[in-house]
Amino acid sequence: MDGEADFMRRALELAEFGRGRVMPNLPVGCVLVRDGEIVAEGWHDHIGGLHAEQMAIAEAEVRGVPTLGTTAYITLEPCNHFGRTPPCTEALLWAGVSHVVIGAADPNPTVRGGGTETLRSGGVNVEEGLLVDECEEQMHEFMHWCRTRRPHVLLKAAIDAHGRIDGDPALPAERFSSEASLGLVHELRADSMAILVGINTVIRDNPSLTVRGPDIGPRDSPLRVVIDPNCRVPGDSVPMVYCAVATLMVHCTDLGAIDDVPHVVRMLL
C-alpha cells in the first residue's frame, strides 16, 4: 500500500467485518501505520466487544509491535465516552499514537467533535475528512437518522414475472424468492433494527421474521413489528408463539378515536 487513501480504504474493508453484528453501534475499522506500513489492524467486531482502535492496539501488543509514534487511520471519529467499553480516545492516548487520520466525524450532534478535541488536547496531531464520502456511505442509515430524525426504511417485496406479490389466495402461499435472493434478504435483516409487516402477511405466510444465516453475534435480534389494526393475528402464528425474538403488535380498532394521530404516525414512520 502507498498513500493515505489506501490505508483508509483498508480500514473501510475491515469495518465491514462488523456489519450486522454491532447494532446499534456503527461499523468501524482502524489500521495502525509506521513508516508507511500497516503494523496492526482492528474493527468493531460485535456489540460489547473491543472497538476498532482498541482491537488494533491489542493486536499490536500481542505481536510485540510498539504503538508509540504510530499513525492511526480510523473510519469514524473515536468515541470519547464510557459505554460498554472505555473511550477509544483514552486507548489511543495510552498507546502513544501520535497522529490520527479520521474519515468521518461522528454524525451524532451531541458528541461530534468531542473525540478530536480530546486527542488534540492530549498532543495528538489529528486530520479529518479523508475519504469522508466513502466513510459516511458506510453508515448512511445512521447519517439519515441524525439528519432527519426519521428511520431509514428499506422496502422489500418478492414479485413474480407478472408483477404479483402473491398467487391465487385460495391456494397455499407460494415462495417467489430464489435461494440467492433469500440470502440477500437475511443480510439486510441482519443490518436492521426492526422487521415490519402487515397482518395479512402474518395470516397468509406465517413468517418467522428472524435473521437466519448471517451471524449477528450477541446483539439483539431485529424487533418484529406487525401492523394489526383489528387484532386479527392468529394465536398460533410464529410471531406470537416464538418468543426468543421480541414482537411489537400495533393494534387500533378506530384511528379516529385516537387523540394524537400525528404522534402515532411519527412513531411508525
PLM feature spans:
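Short beta-strand scaffold segments in enzyme catalytic cores
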Residues: V28-G36, A157-A158
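Short, basic/aromatic recognition patches
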Residues: G3-M23, W145
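Active-site ligand-binding patch in enzyme domains
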Residues: H144-C146, H152-L269
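Short, structured interface segments
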Residues: G129-C146
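Electropositive phosphate-/nucleotide-binding environments in soluble metabolic enzymes
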Residues: A5, R9, R21, H46, ...
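Zn2+-dependent cytidine deaminase-like catalytic core
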Residues: L32, E37-E134, T253-L255
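Short, small/polar residue-rich loop motifs at catalytic or cofactor-binding pockets
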Residues: P24-P27, H152-V153
